[in-house]
Amino acid sequence: MTLKKSFSASLLSPFLIICLIALLSVPVSVGARRLLEEPKPEIPTFPELPKPEMPKLPEFPKLELPKLPEIPKPEMPKLPEIQKPELPTFPELPKMPEFPKFDFPKLPELPKPEETKVPAFTMPKFPGSP
């Protein structure tokens, strides 16, 4: 019973989606067609009014800023270089001895098992069955 419900639900949901898309697409295209067919009303243009002239402002003389005297850069006294302390030396660590690589013995290849052949099974025919 549950298999039939899930099978019918899996077939029904794409069908419903296709129907909804078909129903929603029709009014949009009809509305767009109506917009193209309706003539737009003409709006009358208003006459252009002459622009009043703006009065010109009198020109003011540019103010010159007084020049400031140049101030010499103060010379900084040189600081003596501070010697960095030497780092203590550590004795070298002895090198670790190198170990030879271990060779694993090769395992002999095992022969692949042959597939067992299963004899073909034929259904016996019973009297009265097609």
Curated annotation (Swiss-Prot):
Q: Where is the composition biased (Basic and acidic residues)?
A: 71-84, 98-117
Q: Which domain of life is it from?
A: Eukaryota
Please provide, in alphabetical order, the Gene Ontology terms of the cellular component aspect for this entry. Answer: extracellular region
What is the protein's major site of localization?
A: secreted
Organism of origin:
Arabidopsis thaliana (Mouse-ear cress)
Tell me the protein's name: Protein PELPK2
sequence repeat boundaries on the chain = 47-51, 52-56, 58-62, 63-67, 69-73, 74-78, 80-84, 91-95, 97-101, 102-106, 108-112, 113-117, 121-125
N-terminal signal peptide: 1-32
Q: Which InterPro entries match?
A: PELPK1_2
The reply to whether Coiled coil figures as a keyword in the UniProt entry is no
